[in-house]
């Protein structure tokens, strides 16, 4: 059996929220509270892309443009691909498009946080290990 699909990448729409939350929940093994920031879609510094096969969201990834005092930073977050579609280049294509957005927005650098298990994936795209992240959960 040949598994073929058509990958379309587009910006997130309100109608996508339920599928995105379900994908994040399965991918990150935790519950999301169904409360996507209502200002996200209208924020000119927030971009979320989805890959779609027919009406199924197969992947999602976001970038936030942060204008700091001396430079502009692109922060990639929440990259997830439906487990049935992994290994088909979806995650790579989503991240590459986000890097393109960062370049268009004149970001000085683009960063992301990765689990150890996904770090090789990001290295293949061109990311390199740089700093240790420290965190306090509020």
Where would I find each of the regions flagged by the language model?
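Conserved beta-strand-loop-alpha-helix junction that forms the acyl-donor binding cleft
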Residues: 110-120, 128, 135-138
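Active-site rim helix/loop that mediates acceptor-substrate recognition in acyltransferases
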Residues: 29-48
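Conserved beta-strand in the GNAT
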Residues: 50, 56-65, 75, 80
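Conserved acetyl-CoA pyrophosphate-binding loop and the N-cap/start of the following alpha-helix
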Residues: 85, 89-97
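A short beta-loop-alpha structural element at the N-terminal edge
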Residues: 7-20
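A conserved beta-turn-beta hairpin within the catalytic core of GNAT-like acetyltransferases
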Residues: 66-76, 86, 130
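Conserved GNAT acetyl-CoA-binding A-motif
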Residues: 95, 102-115
């Amino acid at each position: 059996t040949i598994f073929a699909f058509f990958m379309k990448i587009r910006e997130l729409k309100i109608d996508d929220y339920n599928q995105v939350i379900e994908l994040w929940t399965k991918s990150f093994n935790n519950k999301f509270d169904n409360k996507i920031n209502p200002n996200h879609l209208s924020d000119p510094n927030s971009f979320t892309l989805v890959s779609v096969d027919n009406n199924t969201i197969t992947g999602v990834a976001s970038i936030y443009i942060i204008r700091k005092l001396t430079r502009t930073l692109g922060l990639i977050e929440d990259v997830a691909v439906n487990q049935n579609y992994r290994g088909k280049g979806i995650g790579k294509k989503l991240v590459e498009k986000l890097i393109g957005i960062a370049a268009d927005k004149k970001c000085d650098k683009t960063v992301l946080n990765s689990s150890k298990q996904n770090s090789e994936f990001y290295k293949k795209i061109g990311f390199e290990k740089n700093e240790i992240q420290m965190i306090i959960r509020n």
